[in-house]
Amino acid sequence: MVMNNLNPTDFTPWPEQFSQRYREQGYWQQRTLFDYFSDSVKKSPDAIALIDEFGQYSYQNLYQKMISLAAGLSSLGLQRGDNVVLQMANRAEFYLCFFALTMRGIKPVLALPAHRYLELSYFCQHTQAKAYIFSDDIVGFDAQQTAQKLRSSCPSLLHTIVCGQSSHEQIQELDTLYHCAEDDPVTDSVFADQVAFFQLSGGTTGTPKLIPRTHNDYAYSVLGSIQICQFGPQTRYLCVLPVAHNFPLSSPGALGVFYAGGCVVLASDTTPHTAFRLIEKHHITVAALVPPLALLWMKYAESATENIASLTLVQVGGAKFSEAAAMRLPTALHCQLQQVFGMAEGLVNYTRLDDPLSVIVTTQGRPISADDEVMIINDEGEPAAVGEEGLLMTRGPYTIRGYYRAPEHNQRSFTEQGFYITGDRVRRTAEGNIIVTGREKDQINRGGEKIAAEEVENLLLQHQDVHDVALVAIADEFLGERSCAIVVPDNGKTLKPITLKRFLHAQGLAEFKIPDHIHFVDELPKTPVGKVNKKWLRTQYSH
């Protein structure tokens, strides 16, 4: 029987016959995310687990601080079943909060540093969050001012907690919550079938959808990734990407490093200079990058003076990595390339470490699990032949069956048989490797950050001088895609791009969602059935 901490209308469980199979196959081991961390503490308590710009922590140090923080959070009245929005820069406190919350059955919503008031208020209201925990060192963001605004607009929000120095009496400092606690944390009321936390979808409509991840499914994804990527106590992993992203959290990411007994090193910024300095200083062996960062690293390496000989593996994912760039990377960085194609909703594909170079360069790999069911449907609605392009659908032991509190969206995103409709267009080789060819959903992938066109369009339409608008992706050599807004002004009004960009900023939209380009036209082109012809717009404005 599945024990869960959400209302049945909020969470879509796996059907019992699937749950039973996943348990029998050993995928779901009925242990919490914190249980696996505790295993590493017992094996190597004095080993260094984490290094950030402020210091380093052994496994035992982290363990004790997690338990202490969990006690402090409980003293505020936070309890099993509550939701908390967590937004942190790349620092140790992210993992301390993540484990302190999940070990008590409190579910963090993993907001990204790029999110602003518009997204954060939605997360708080949609989940009825009891607390907002944040760091005050997110570049270009007055988080404490935003916290005050959230406190006023979200009735459920009882606590705002800052990692840093508080500037307001209603904002509590995280450092005051490290309470004395017993060595053994209270986890007896937390079941592995329960939702542990929420991740965020890229989304194609409105604000991001919330992805409920259970202890069982997420742990299996991490453990399977560890095996494929051969992480172990010797692994020294550089986290350059935002810590809350699925890729650097679980593929195998920081959780994979912790569970394998290795060491995570956090970069405070994304510059190659910082990364290469950390690689040399801490003898980094593995790093995970999105394509734009991989290109920057390759360029920087041409004149770099740092010694990065310890680096043995670079993972590239989050967006399609061009074949030409993939071919160059092993030589440019003197290490192995691994392509990763995954999604926060579940399915993750890897090229294997022993794959031929031709496979690593030209494909995005194959799934973690033998029970990852992958269907590719062609334009006629039939299963695609080998090598034929089609729409990717999937279900499996770590792919969700529904978004949180989104019944209408779930009807569009999941089939009656429980397959998740990814929106990715792919081909599959005879060996089972997947090649990503594009997107079917109305979504822009800007260097790994997903933008729902409809969300930005709806905000622009709120401007009094905008009559109509279409947001499309245009190809970009560096980011993969950039966003381009084609705007029809109202009644011949004169508008400037900067005016609309300032308007979107004022609405609290995340910086990466602000259109890179804005063009003005008299009318938008239409298809024969009266829809905006975005295909024509993409072609027209890509030059």
Predicted features and spans:
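Conserved AMP-binding A3 loop
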Residues: 58-60, 196-220
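Conserved ATP/PPi-binding loop(s) of AMP-dependent carboxylate-activating enzymes
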Residues: 367-371, 382-413, 451
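AMP-binding/adenylate-forming catalytic core of the ANL superfamily
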Residues: 115-122, 132-134, 287, 396, ...
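Structural core segment of the AMP-binding/adenylate-forming
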Residues: 3, 106-175, 493
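Gly/Ser/Thr-rich phosphate-binding loop
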Residues: 284-288, 298-359, 373
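Conserved beta-loop-beta connector loops within the AMP-binding
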Residues: 360, 375-393, 430-431, 493-497, ...
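Conserved AMP-binding/adenylate-forming core of the ANL superfamily
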Residues: 29-30, 34-38, 46-91, 95-99, ...
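Conserved AMP-binding/adenylation subdomain of ANL enzymes
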Residues: 219-236, 246-286, 299-300
